[in-house]
Amino acid sequence: MSTRRVYFFGETPENQPANSELCRKVLGGKGISLAAMIKLGMPVPLGFTITCQTCVEYQKTASWPKGLKEEVASNLKLLEEKMGKTFGDNTNPLLVSVRSGAAVSMPGMMDTILNLGLNDESVKGLAAVTGNARFAYDSYRRFMQMFGDVCLGIDHDKFEHALDAVKTRYGRKTDPELTADELEEVCEAYRKICVAATGKTFPQCPHEQLELAINAVFKSWTNPRAQAYRTLNKLDHNMGTAVNVQSMVFGNTGDDSGTGVGFTRCPKTGEKFSYLYGEFLQNAQGEDVVAGIRTPVNLKEMPTINASWKACYDELSLIYAKLEGYYNDMVDLEFTVENGKLWMLQARAGKRTGFAMVRIAIDMCKEGMLTEEEALLRIDANKINEFLFKRFDPSVKPVVLGKGIPASPGAAVGVICFCPMRTCELAEQGKKVILTRIETSPEDILGMDRAVGILTARGGQTSHAAVVARGMGKCCVAGADCCQINYATKTLVIGDRKFKEGDFISINGTTGEIYNGAVQTIEPGITDDLQTIMDWSDKYRVLKIRTNADTPHDAAVARKFGAEGIGLCRTEHMFFAADRIMAMREMILSDDEGARRTALNKLLPFQREDFIGIFKAMDGKGVNIRLLDPPLHEFLPHTRDLQKKLAEDMNKKHRHIHERVEDLHEVNPMLGFRGVRLGIVYPEISEMQVRAILEAACIVSREGVTVKPEIMIPVLFSENEMEIMHALVNRVAASVFKEHGTTVDYEVGTMIELPRACVMADKIAQTAQYFSFGTNDLTQTTFGISRDDAGKFIPKYIDRGIFKVDPFVTLDQQGVGALMKMAIEGGRSTRTDMKIGICGEQTDPASILFLHKIGLNYVSCSPYRVPVARVAAAIAAIKARTNQ
């Protein structure tokens, strides 16, 4: 049986519901939305969809698979019959759009072509049959520009410059002011551009145009911006895009025509208004709205234009309600009005901010559309981070330079940069950047990702900048027409103020205001809506959530966000403070044990005070403290000048310091003299740390604070190491408890971060009371990859399909995960109730689902990621219980 590659709108694979997962994989997001709207009885221009799998086949051979040409031809013939027009006819031509449509929405990342089928002769026929020459030549020049850019590879700016030249010649400020004759001049200029760039005339055969356009959409699946978007959003590079060939309807035939984009609820806040939310442009085509080249009008103004527009508004109101009821979600829709008749072009679950996501989930639950569990499954856990962004200090009164459209909420402070690639460079240097553009385009995606905020002079709520910024959770102010941006001089002028690249500004994505300089921000808190989601999450999750915290402040912040303990307290971070680094260096540079103990006695009070603060902050929650992990050379200066300064401060010879640094240097420190190896060779270091932990525990215990210290031994690979360190801890504990006249409960466990430790887990568990996985080092040692050097090749590995995602971001379930399962089974075969957690930074939802399934007790993350982990753990529990 041959594989079917083309479906006419309304048809679905195996007659499945249009919103089924099978249909999404075959027809793509746009394809299933068109099929669904037809089945719902909505006005949709007819057409057909070429499947996502066909794109995958095309990528392998760069040619159409056998049978595709015949399927396209038969569906094109059916379209001609239903529309009563002929493709390629010069008197009344059937014109089509060719659009991409992947299974997962990738707004603006791939290519679109409108008005395909026009040529030098059929444009005259279109003018005659419509009686509107201006419309015909406007459609032709749009088609030539899109086709030239997408299919012929001609720089988009060349067409824009030619258009601007004609507008300047005739004194026209906007595109709609151009007459039919003037637009015909634009078309002639475009013909010359095509000949100059390709050596050939602009393609005149509509069937050739269609084949080239379909190929271009297939190829756009692998363009750099699309690949970057998929990598940023962890999307499968192998799913391919569908191609939708759809009969054209025109929003540029006059003032009773137009095009628009709407949302059934506000994509910024989630609010459901009494009026329709969205934007539209009269006498325009669809790309005009999302491109942000013209600033559109609010949809609620539509019924005030005239009776025809009011009728469209009323029909659109019914469609809003029907679509939201069908999707049970906030819907993003696109439409065109042609000579007063409404046509629907697309509907899909809309991109939204984290604030809107939470508000919509809660409201739909209140409205009876969703259960709590269903509402939680609509939450993207990573977008919870947006609630934790800083906001501007209300006590500060900044200088307001101007105002644009508040396109994506938040507060962003950074230096101005006009170039997306330069933004990436500055971000690499640690600078916070406001990407400042006339308007953004899909090519800007990497710069937008690295910027802290986005400012555009053109565009509206539904422009590319706004949609992508909301999807990324970036602060964005769009359509700030007070901004004059000059890329050549790298300047931004607002009123009488002139700014150059590198100057600081601040933007408020909630109000749309632009402020002078760097405005002070304050820390966020838990809102009522977020608290509701947290309460729901805590009701359904099984995994406990701990935090990584090295200071009392970090511990207090994590408790505020709901942390149920500390999963990793890194003691080495405490030694880098200015008031203790010298004592640490004295200890390292000591020539014998006695001198080392003297230096360690100086460090003991510092460590004890740190632990007192942390124990008080956690008040009864478990605190997992890792003994010294990094090699000693990391605490010493590496340059000659700094070594000389240290020698002077310690009253030692420079040569002595330099030789000691050289002695401690390691060829491969990750696998060298670190962790448990330090504790066994220099037991006095571990003894000091254990004493500090347990003395602090005794002190706070006497003050009435419940304390649960957990002492973790890092980087071990054998039960022998565990036995030696367990005995050391018990020996120090006995001494401390005798001195303080009291005891506290404590546990001794280990960090599982080497493959051999996973294999030997049953034996290690004979002494270790708990395990905590260190997934960073376990990933490094399993793959044989240094995390610090992986950036040189992991992106290429992802491009080539060797990795689907970065294994240091999303846990490798097949390799590292298999070792973890082995360790869990081994550990619990010895201790059936063994507590097992993870102390690497793990809030990736896919990783948390896996960790839930293999039976971990807790995960741990940075303080500000605790709410994210709480939600991800709840989603994991719901999915596991419902086999999703």
Curated annotation (Swiss-Prot):
Region (Linker 2): 508-542
Binding site for ATP: R99
InterPro entries, per the entry: ATP_grasp_subdomain_1, PEP-util_enz_mobile_dom, PEP_util_AS, PEP_util_C, PEP_util_CS, Phosphohistidine_dom_sf, PPDK_AMP/ATP-bd, Pyruvate_phosphate_dikinase
Record region (C-terminal): 543-884
Residues that coordinate or bind Mg(2+): E753, D777
Top-rank EC class of the record's enzyme: transferase
Positions bearing Phosphothreonine: T462
Binding site for substrate: R570, R626, E753, G774, T775, N776, D777
Activity modulation notes: Activated by light-induced dephosphorylation. Inhibited by dark-induced phosphorylation. Both reactions are catalyzed by PDRP1.
Molecular function as annotated in GO: ATP binding; kinase activity; metal ion binding; pyruvate, phosphate dikinase activity
Catalytic activity: pyruvate + phosphate + ATP = phosphoenolpyruvate + AMP + diphosphate + H(+)
Region (Central): 409-507
Chain positions covered by the region annotation Linker 1: 352-408
EC number: 2.7.9.1
Family membership noted in the UniProt record: Belongs to the PEP-utilizing enzyme family.
Domain notes: The N-terminal domain contains the ATP/Pi binding site, the central domain the pyrophosphate/phosphate carrier histidine, and the C-terminal domain the pyruvate binding site.
Protein known as: Pyruvate, phosphate dikinase
Organism annotation: Giardia intestinalis (Giardia lamblia)
Biological classification of the source: Eukaryota, Metamonada, Diplomonadida, Hexamitidae, Giardiinae
